[in-house]
């Protein structure tokens, strides 16, 4: 059968540069859709020969949206290879900074990147289907969203002197103690931001209730789930063991990040620079899994803060206690995690050790290699470093959140295209739904390929004879 080809390049309101190609049959139905990551990966090679103590300042330059995640993962890998476990007060301060990262990133994505599609509508005029349109539609909600992100950034800057590329965590701990004035400033703002997170949760729950048909047909498919948990299988974002659960929610493995290569392999497709991680024992594609908010909430049994845990139980009831497979519920899970991060930040600020000056372990016992792991807002982030006797890096491997989710995004793009895109004249709103299949995962493509890219969007539609029949531009 003759086919048409539609190209969406780049996908907008995500971080980084990707495109989607939709191959259509002559009858206007979709044959297949592909998610291409076309930034070239190279950052790991740049790091070879550098001192491991430099990595917590080098790797955040991969990304301006989640620099704290790379900053902390690099420091944690440095702890391991230098044999210098961080003292408890330093771990508390690192985790507090990480909660700020989660708050600002989740808040920004829900309200400003993913939210416009939901609050304004997938078919809304693309010229204002963004934060500008949100300001016009609901200025009060938009102001709350901005203040929520500002609070997350304030946590980071209170600790690291600046919110972008902070200078704080180092192998063995952190480089300066916290102070009571900073603690008090942050504590005074938490109650307001908890209320904003509750508003966000109610917004997405109401939207899902009013759009249940879309929720139930928009990229719903089974996978495994992957992420950090506590020893009791509670949600963990800073440090813990990696838990991998199956499509039915049962536990498949629990292992230390130091041993991830024993359990995870990577599949390659010719149409993407980004590899596809999977669970070795099940093979490809049966071993594909999801990470990030939806993956983490399916992967944990409970949350150790009261408000977020109460919401988690409602979330888990959506599919009768089985894993929640609906891609659009990523937004709901994201706001539950935002609420947890706010509650957890309050717990950390109340800990007496948060003001301790015991913040750095200067002992050294070099190891040949080590892994740092953290739950970045978008999912599990692994930094694996190999060093020589001088502490110089001989090899670097970064497995980032968006890489873990590559299968899920590719599958979602294919399913959404087949469900919503109909020819012969393809509407902009149809293609925006395909973009949202990626956007819901909140991908950071500069992280996944360790590069940066941006360009205008143009969609070209070719008929079954290969002639250009339609052009859509943003």
Would you name each region that the model predicts?
Residues 1-378, 400-474:
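Active-site bordering "gate/hinge" segments
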Residues 378, 383-385, 395:
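A translation/RNA-centric and nucleic-acid-associated enzymatic feature enriched
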Residues 391:
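Active-site catalytic microenvironments in core metabolic enzymes, especially phosphate/sugar-handling
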Residues 394-396, 400:
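Active-site/pore-lining binding-face segments in mid-to-C-terminal subdomains
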